[in-house]
């Protein structure tokens, strides 16, 4: 659907070259929700602006449906942009227009007949749950309602691609969940390809099928959501994952661990998360088990469990217990931690 091939964007500032995007190669499949995460200045927003040619790449090519877009004429570019909807962190609504007027705006630009505009806007108002707000103005709406208007407006021209630029960053947690559920509904019912950028890993966890991590203009890690979450390779990705799975033990906890105790990280996937493995080894081996941290999250309908445990006992018994864990519980990873 969307392909970036060795794409770079360089700005000349004060006689210096700034690489906002550097040699990025990515593919976004049709109908998926693809997340791009990174800290401020990572190059996320610049990469998005390249998709609809608000910025042109300094090097490399960008293709949509196998058609290279960097050389499109003005007329062709106008048609392309009608296929791409966009929602923003700051909503970008017209304060002087009603909710109906904001949603209708791109249809008027496309010279859609008035009766079709009315039908389409009413359809979208129902879809985003704002049927009773058609005649309200943006100042009369909550942040979540404003973003719903933004989503409806982005869908007005029946695009193939929806770009989300930090779409939930200005919202409270409850409203964020509501908007993410709406975006999942958009993806499911319209089979829309969604390209989303954020600096919040919990947003990626809730909605994305695949994710790329950007740092200093480069993609440093990319893959399926489950793989990136459960096996983060880079330090930056590990830090993002810890914002959702904060398994860092406080010094006060480490200080209480008895001499001779050993800490292990256990990770479980799927049905493994429901197995009583710790009670089994406590009963069948001469080992004391102290759970220091544990959680279970769901990633694309697959459970992922994460435990940090302290094992106390003779080294021989601990090794027997670990061997059982590895063989019987399909232990994904056991990692010793220094206390």
Swiss-Prot record:
One Pfam family per UniProt: NIL
Localization, UniProt: Cell membrane
Catalytic activity: L-methionine(out) + ATP + H2O = L-methionine(in) + ADP + phosphate + H(+); D-methionine(out) + ATP + H2O = D-methionine(in) + ADP + phosphate + H(+)
Matching CDD domains: ABC_MetN_methionine_transporter
GO cellular component, one term: plasma membrane
Function of the molecule: Part of the ABC transporter complex MetNIQ involved in methionine import. Responsible for energy coupling to the transport system.
Protein name, per record: Methionine import ATP-binding protein MetN 2
Organism listed in the record: Bacillus cereus (strain ATCC 10987 / NRS 248)
Gene from which this protein is expressed: metN2
């Amino acid at each position: 659907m969307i392909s970036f091939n060795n794409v770079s964007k360089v700005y000349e500032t004060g006689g210096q070259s700034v690489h906002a995007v550097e040699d990025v190669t990515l593919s976004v499949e049709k109908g998926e929700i693809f997340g791009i995460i990174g800290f401020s200045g990572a190059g996320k927003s610049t990469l998005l602006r390249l998709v609809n040619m608000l910025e042109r790449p300094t090097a490399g090519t960008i293709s949509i449906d196998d058609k290279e877009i960097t050389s499109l004429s003005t007329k062709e570019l106008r048609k392309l942009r009608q296929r791409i909807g966009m929602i923003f962190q700051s909503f970008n609504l017209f304060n002087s227009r009603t909710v109906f007027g904001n949603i209708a705006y791109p249809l008027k630009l496309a010279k859609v007949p008035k009766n079709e505009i009315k039908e389409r806007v009413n359809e979208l108002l129902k879809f985003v749950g704002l049927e009773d707000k058609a005649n309200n103005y943006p100042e009369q709406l909550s942040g979540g309602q404003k973003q719903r208007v933004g989503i409806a407006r982005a869908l007005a021209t029946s695009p193939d691609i929806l770009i989300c630029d930090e779409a939930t960053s200005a919202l409270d947690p409850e409203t964020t969940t509501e908007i993410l559920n709406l975006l999942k509904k958009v993806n499911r019912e319209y089979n829309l390809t969604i390209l989303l950028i954020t600096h919040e890993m919990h947003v990626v966890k809730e909605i994305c099928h695949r994710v790329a991590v950007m740092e200093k203009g480069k993609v440093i890690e990319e893959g399926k959501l489950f793989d990136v979450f459960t096996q983060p390779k880079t330090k930056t990705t590990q830090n993002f994952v810890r914002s959702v799975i904060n398994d860092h033990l406080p010094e006060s906890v480490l200080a209480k661990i008895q001499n001779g105790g050993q800490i292990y990280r256990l990770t479980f996937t799927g049905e493994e998360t429901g197995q009583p493995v710790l009670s089994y080894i406590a009963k069948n081996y001469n080992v004391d088990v102290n759970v220091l941290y544990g959680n279970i999250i769901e990633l694309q309908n697959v459970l992922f469990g994460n435990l940090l445990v302290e094992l106390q006992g003779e080294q021989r018994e601990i090794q027997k217990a670990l061997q059982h864990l590895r063989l019987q519980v399909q232990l994904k990873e056991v990692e010793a931690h220094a206390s």
